[in-house]
């Protein structure tokens, strides 16, 4: 009898290839440890398929998971997703390489610390220029709706194949404080300012978010778009033990163990 599958996905909190860019610390402390899917798979005695990739957005995560559900169907016992930011977008370049803009928002405007900076390219510059043009006042509504729609589609696919699943946020769904910082520095126009009250209003009234809460309450933590319900809120509170360094807040080896235990406990509530 074939071993059943744990299907996992996410961004750098989940990516087995993750390696910290903080060169100020020993290489042994920058990566190479088992990530939570590997640890959780051993606990559950499941074969692990992990589609996570650092810096990816929720569209990438959902597409990878949906493809695996289509491929393996009821061979999948459990699906656990640690979702990413809503404002990360995937594109294909002329050579069909999958690239992501923005991996780190402030790097588009060249304002981030060198450890986080990505090389500016034509696509990044073109993307940043869009935010100086007025007229797209439904940008945030459409962006958030896209993430919620993908979450709903994955939940429905899991339900169809009787796959046990849970969703959690790794980082906060959308860092409106960061976008306000960009706005205050005059780098984007008024139409792209995102106030806290507007962010919560958009999330609270989104039809897909409401359906997730209605039909899959045990599988999610509602409201899952709040920082306090993210895994980052746990690692940040215990940063000395659970994160890589002062400049890199990704979970370290101990942080990955914490994530595995946290997600294992969450799965017990949907059994």
Please tell me what each predicted stretch does.
Residues 1-66, 71, 258:
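Serine-esterase "nucleophile elbow" of acetyl-processing enzymes
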Residues 66-253, 257-271:
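Alpha-helical cap/lid subdomain in secreted, periplasmic
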């Amino acid at each position: 009898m074939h071993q059943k599958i744990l299907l996992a996905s996410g961004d750098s909190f989940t990516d087995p290839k993750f390696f910290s860019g903080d060169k100020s610390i020993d290489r042994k402390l920058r990566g190479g440890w088992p990530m939570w899917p590997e640890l959780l798979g051993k606990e559950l005695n499941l074969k692990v398929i992990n589609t996570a990739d650092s810096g990816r957005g929720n569209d990438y995560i959902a597409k990878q998971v949906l493809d695996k559900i289509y491929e393996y169907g009821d061979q999948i016992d459990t699906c656990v997703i640690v979702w990413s930011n809503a404002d990360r977008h995937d594109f294909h370049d002329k050579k069909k390489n999958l690239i992501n803009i923005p991996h780190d928002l402030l790097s588009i405007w060249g304002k981030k610390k060198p450890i986080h900076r990505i090389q500016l390219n034509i696509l990044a510059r073109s993307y940043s220029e869009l935010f100086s043009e007025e007229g797209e006042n439904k940008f945030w509504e459409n962006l958030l709706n896209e993430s919620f729609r993908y979450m709903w589609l994955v939940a429905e696919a899991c339900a169809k194949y009787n796959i046990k699943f849970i969703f959690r946020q790794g980082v906060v769904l959308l860092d409106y404080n960061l976008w306000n910082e960009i706005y205050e520095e005059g780098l984007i126009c008024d139409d792209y300012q995102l106030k806290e009250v507007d962010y919560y209003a958009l999330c609270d009234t989104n039809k897909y978010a409401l359906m997730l809460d209605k039909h899959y309450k045990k599988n999610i933590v509602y409201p899952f778009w709040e920082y306090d319900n993210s895994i980052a809120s746990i690692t940040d509170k215990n940063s000395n033990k659970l994160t890589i360094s002062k400049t890199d807040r990704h979970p370290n080896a101990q942080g990955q163990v914490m994530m595995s235990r946290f997600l294992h406990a969450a799965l017990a509530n949907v059994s």
